Amino acid sequence: MPETTQDTCASAKDSPFFIKNLLNSDSKPSKPKPILAPTKAGLDGSFSLSQVGEINFPRFELPTQRFALPAYLERASAWWYPYTLSASAHLHRTEAAQKARDSSPTTGTDRDSPELVLKSDPDAKDDEDDNKSGDEIVLEEGDTEDGKKEGGIDDWKKSDDGADKKPCRKKKTRTVFSRSQVFQLESTFDMKRYLSSSERAGLAASLHLTETQVKIWFQNRRNKWKRQLAAELEAANLSHAAAQRIVRVPILYHENSASESTNTAGNVPVSQPLLTFPHPVYYSHPIVTSVPLLRPV
């Protein structure tokens, strides 16, 4: 019986479920496996890891040799944390990744091509857009504003040029002739309406004018002469139309009837009309034509 109790106590002490053993096992935890073990070699080139509890978190520390790494380390170190870089570093990484993608073959894994991972992760895109520096936004707005200002200036210049071109019309020069020149030109025009080239040249030389001035004067004088002829012809037509409205009115006489002549004495002469006209009278007024001239009885 005592041997049995001793064996039971010894087995209880050696049991892993004993309180002391459980406390000892809790005080000495086993070393956890690192979560980021496959990518630790690539992450050491860009930033180090800090351990908080049992989870490893990256510390955002960029070494000075960060921008001098080759393209492979550039892609391997920043393919899953694109938002850890600043705007300038992100631009540098994008240019290096573009060059590496152009030089590498088209076939490859997702780890070798960071662009595929970035495209498939919308959260990474949002973080990347949020972490853009304010300098980039200001520069973009400034560029657009400058472009708008330049475009506005060009439009304003074009509108001014168009406004200047519209009223720009060549003014006609007006030649002032002296009295002697006008008299000589009028006398020549009365003799001849049209001049030959030699006559025009001689007249221009005698009047100290150019041939163009003499030619223009004769053209204007012929137009004036034609207008005068048209006005005279119109006046003649009006007078002819007025003459056509004149109506011929004959003079009417009332002869003595036979009964009156028989009743009167033979010695009494017959009364003659007071007014006698050897030829008919013309009246131009229409009212007078309707009233005949009667002899008093």
Swiss-Prot record:
Regarding tissue, the record states:
Expressed in the ear placode and vesicle and in cells forming the vestibulo-acoustic ganglion. Also expressed in the lateral line.
On induction, the UniProt comment says: Regulated by fgf3 and fgf8 in otic vesicle.
Q: Where in the cell is it found?
A: Nucleus
Record's keyword terms, sorted: Developmental protein, Differentiation, DNA-binding, Homeobox, Neurogenesis, Nucleus, Transcription, Transcription regulation
For the region Disordered, what residue ranges are annotated? 24-43, 96-172
One Pfam family linked to the record: Homeodomain
Record field: compositional bias (Basic and acidic residues): 109-123, 145-166
Residue ranges: DNA binding: 170-229
Tell me where the signal peptide lies.
Answer: none
**GO terms assigned for molecular function:** DNA-binding transcription factor activity, RNA polymerase II-specific; RNA polymerase II transcription regulatory region sequence-specific DNA binding
Lineage top rank: taxon: Eukaryota
Broad class of the protein's primary localization? nucleus
What is one GO cellular-component annotation here? nucleus
Q: Which PROSITE patterns match?
A: HOMEOBOX_1, HOMEOBOX_2
In the record, biological process GO terms are: cell differentiation; inner ear morphogenesis; otolith development; posterior lateral line development; posterior lateral line neuromast primordium migration; regulation of transcription by RNA polymerase II; spinal cord development
The UniProt similarity line reads: Belongs to the HMX homeobox family.
State the protein's purpose.
Transcription factor involved in specification of neuronal cell types and which is required for inner ear and hypothalamus development. Binds to the 5'-CAAGTG-3' core sequence.
- What is the protein name stated in its UniProt record? Homeobox protein HMX3
Q: What organism is listed for this UniProt entry?
A: Danio rerio
Lineage, opening ranks: Eukaryota, Metazoa, Chordata, Craniata, Vertebrata
